[in-house]
Amino acid sequence: MIDKIQILDNNIIELAKTFHTEQNTKIAKFLTEFGGKKGVIAFTIITMIIILIYYMKKSKEKKLHKEEDVSMFKARITGYAVALSVPITLGIAVVTKTVIKMLVNRPRPNAFPEIMVETGKSFPSGHSIGIATMVTILIYFVIISDMNRVLKYILVTLLILFSIVIASTRLYMGVHYLSDVIAGLTLGYIIGT
């Protein structure tokens, strides 16, 4: 089974090479940053702000409806707690990724050094875990929001596609195998929930 996965992984890297152009490489290098440390930190901050705004709005709605001050206070405290859970969830993703990388100890392919060379271990993809975790948290807030259903479906679909595109850049650049990326996305979606 492992041999078949490795054969598929190698074939996907060869397939990725057929898409290499100067323009595609520029795009991939730009997009991959969304799954890197700076990108995930930015996503974390944006997500925390969205959460705080959402719960502050809920708190104001309670005030407009002349509900008890306790109810408004609960909405605000919930907002702060949920916002703080975002970096905690991301921390869990980072620890999980680090432990699995140490246990599996899979070398990176670094198949296209002219495009990018990464250090560290390959399995699972940290970019994939990071972006999938953040996207899953955002999806949750899209789902519970007051948006109409069609807009929710569109946003959820776009967020999932975005995470897949970011993960795919790691294949394009030859710094991860397909199985690394699939494992990273799967772990990120699970941890994000």
Question: Where do the PLM segments sit?
Answer:
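Membrane-interface helix-boundary signature
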Residues: 25-28, 33-36, 79-83, 148-155, ...
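Hydrophobic alpha-helical transmembrane segments of polytopic
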Residues: 40-47, 86, 90, 155, ...
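Small-residue packing motifs within transmembrane alpha-helices
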Residues: 31, 79-81, 85, 89, ...
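Membrane-interface loops
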Residues: 57-61, 65-149
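Hydrophobic alpha-helical transmembrane segments
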Residues: 35-56, 134-138, 142
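Membrane-embedded catalytic cores of phosphoryl/pyrophosphoryl-handling enzymes
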Residues: 49, 114-193
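N-terminal transmembrane-helix/juxtamembrane module of multi-pass inner/ER membrane proteins
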Residues: 1-43, 101-116
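Transmembrane helix-loop junctions and nearby membrane-interface residues
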Residues: 55, 59, 102, 167, ...
